[in-house]
Amino acid sequence: MADPMNHSTGHQQQQKYRQYNPYQQVNLPYRKLYELPTSPEFLFEEEATKKRLTWGENLTFFTGWGYCTGSVLGAFKGTIAGMRAAERGESLKIRTNRILNSGGLVARRGGNCLGSVGLMFAAMESGVTYMRDGDDGSLTTVIAGLATGVLYRAASGPRSAVVAGAVGGVAALAAVAGRRIVKRFVPI
């Protein structure tokens, strides 16, 4: 068997033979196929300069965070209610069962409630942004909060819908103001 290394030049080892590459003469554009861009592509420069979520991402974000937040807050509230409802003389198993059942029941209700509010808010915000020709400002968020409150409590009557709309508008205004304060004073 022949040694592929030439040892005749002393300490320098030179390779006599090169490794066979079956694709050397084939010029396929496979490199271009797998060299994908890392940033999103836009048709117009105006789209690239705006930093906002698409309507689908917006919908997923607000619905998911609403459900998770409602579930955590509901579980906490249900656990406290389960602890308060415990009676003297109950065994540890029964107390634990009562706490878990109460926490799970309230967590489901809270998660579904805030998840549906998040879904409505995301839909309203995307709709208001579309109606305002893509202007995604603070006024859009406040209008979406107001409309979400009105829509959420519309089945309870007009007075309840107006109050819920005011609460939604104030909550959205507080969120916008809080976001500006955080941007100004918190170095991120």
Swiss-Prot record:
InterPro entries found in the cross-reference section: Tim23-like
Spans traversing the lipid bilayer: 63-83, 111-130, 138-154, 161-178
Assigned keywords, A-Z: Membrane, Mitochondrion, Mitochondrion inner membrane, Transmembrane, Transmembrane helix
Molecular function (Gene Ontology), one example: transmembrane transporter activity
Membrane-protein topology: Multi-pass membrane protein
Superkingdom field: Eukaryota
Main location group: mitochondrion
Distribution of this protein across tissues and organs: Expressed in roots. Detected in cotyledons, leaves and flowers.
Compartments in which it is found: Mitochondrion inner membrane
GO annotation, cellular component aspect: mitochondrial inner membrane
Keyword Membrane attached: yes
Pfam families: Tim17
Protein purpose: Essential component of the TIM17:23 complex, a complex that mediates the translocation of transit peptide-containing proteins across the mitochondrial inner membrane. Links the inner and outer membranes.
Family: Belongs to the Tim17/Tim22/Tim23 family.
Subunit structure comment from the entry: Component of the TIM17:23 complex at least composed of TIM23, TIM17 and TIM50. The complex interacts with the TIM44 component of the PAM complex.
UniProt name for this protein: Mitochondrial import inner membrane translocase subunit TIM23-3
Organism annotation: Arabidopsis thaliana (Mouse-ear cress)
Record gene name: TIM23-3
